[in-house]
Regions:
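Canonical Radical SAM [4Fe-4S] cluster-binding loop centered on the CxxxCxxC motif
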Residues: 2-49
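Short cysteine clusters
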Residues: 25-32, 257, 261, 275-278, ...
């Protein structure tokens, strides 16, 4: 572990406003990522003094992305209060939400804010089919109608919206319909994709599978094609690279882990403000987190395959890899190398 940079380099914050995890969430997502670091913590709701301390400790903070506890529909009023504190200090805010609660929730969330200071609201929309929504969200108390009601409010108020699907094998064909639907109906041109991963699901069995390497490469290619045609802004993790792609990435392969970046993930806890530069790693290895009072950030440089790259894949897929370790997959005549999910295609057409 290296101590490389001070907190004054941080410009972008992603914030969990407490540690309720699945316990009090409005949904019960079967692929919920709040299964690692959070399940060991005492359930806790953050307070405004912690927000003020974050602002004090991060003097060059420009953007605060609020995820809630662990969704903004759980602690909507506190997320609103926190956003106002960031806004008061000339920090732009963003929100991530399942869309739970529709109009009622989004109106409470942004009440009293200057909408021009809201960079976007991100909606987790994994499918357009209500039965699939209920399955993935683990509840029938949310529907596409609720999500659309919330999105329409933002669109009407000129608050930027991005759609963030998480794709598993279960819904791997839904991405085209998602893009087309929101593009045509609401003129939404911003989509950021996640690949469903298992790093924080390892100690509980879930009926989900990771998308196969060749299928994922097909999805990435199709998303790029659609994005270019419709002039979209996209982010999509690459995950599996062939040899030619790996050769191009060699110079940058350790950049994130070794040098960090300008982004920080924070959880508000009962006994402090916990930080990490790599949320994936932190879910499995809490030693790569630190308390904000330490005044220093921690990074790790890895040679070869970071543990998280393997553990983000399900056991079935790992068993299909070349040496059973999830590092290399032999597909037809080429090798596909499993790389960190932070290596993403970020394009705006």
């Amino acid at each position: 572990m290296k101590r490389l940079t001070a907190l004054d380099k941080v410009k972008d914050l992603t914030l969990y406003t407490g540690t309720f995890g699945r316990e009090k969430c409005t949904c019960n997502c079967i692929g919920c990522t709040q299964g690692g670091i959070i399940k060991e913590k005492e359930p806790y709701q953050g307070n405004i003094n912690q927000i003020k301390k974050i602002i004090e400790k991060l003097p060059n903070l420009e953007n605060a992305y609020l995820l809630g506890n662990p969704d903004i529909s759980v602690d909507t009023d506190f997320c609103n209060e926190a956003a106002k504190e960031f806004e008061k200090n000339n920090i732009s805010v963003m929100f991530s939400t399942s869309g739970y609660g529709g109009n009622k929730t989004i109106k409470r969330l942004v009440s009293g804010l200057n909408f021009k200071n809201i960079k976007y609201v991100s909606y987790s929309v994994d499918t357009l089919e209500d039965d699939k929504i209920h399955y993935l969200k683990g509840t029938k108390n949310i529907s596409l109608k609720d999500i659309e009601e919330s999105i329409k409010f933002c669109v009407d108020m000129n608050i930027p919206v991005k759609i963030q699907p998480t794709l598993w094998e279960y819904n791997q064909e839904d991405y085209i319909d998602i893009i087309n639907y929101f593009y045509k109906k609401y003129d939404i041109k911003w989509f950021t994709f996640h690949a469903g991963s298992f790093e924080s699901l390892k100690n509980r069995k879930v009926p989900l599978k990771h998308i196969e390497p060749l299928k994922w490469k097909e999805i990435v290619k199709n998303i790029q094609f659609i994005a270019e045609k419709k002039k979209l802004r996209i982010v999509v993790p690459r995950i599996f690279l062939n040899q030619e792609e790996m050769d191009k990435e060699k110079e940058n392969i350790h950049t994130y882990c070794a040098n960090g970046g300008t982004g920080l993930r924070i959880w508000l806890e009962n006994n402090g403000i916990r930080c990490t530069y790599c949320p994936l790693l932190a879910e499995l290895h809490p030693e790569f987190t630190f308390l904000i009072d330490e005044e220093v950030t921690h990074f790790i440089r890895t040679d070869g395959v970071c543990a998280v790259r393997r553990e983000a894949l399900d056991e079935n897929l790992i068993s299909k890899s070349w040496n059973g370790k999830g590092a290399v997959f032999k597909q037809n005549t080429e090798n596909l190398y499993n790389v960190c999910r932070f290596f993403s295609i970020r394009e705006q057409y």
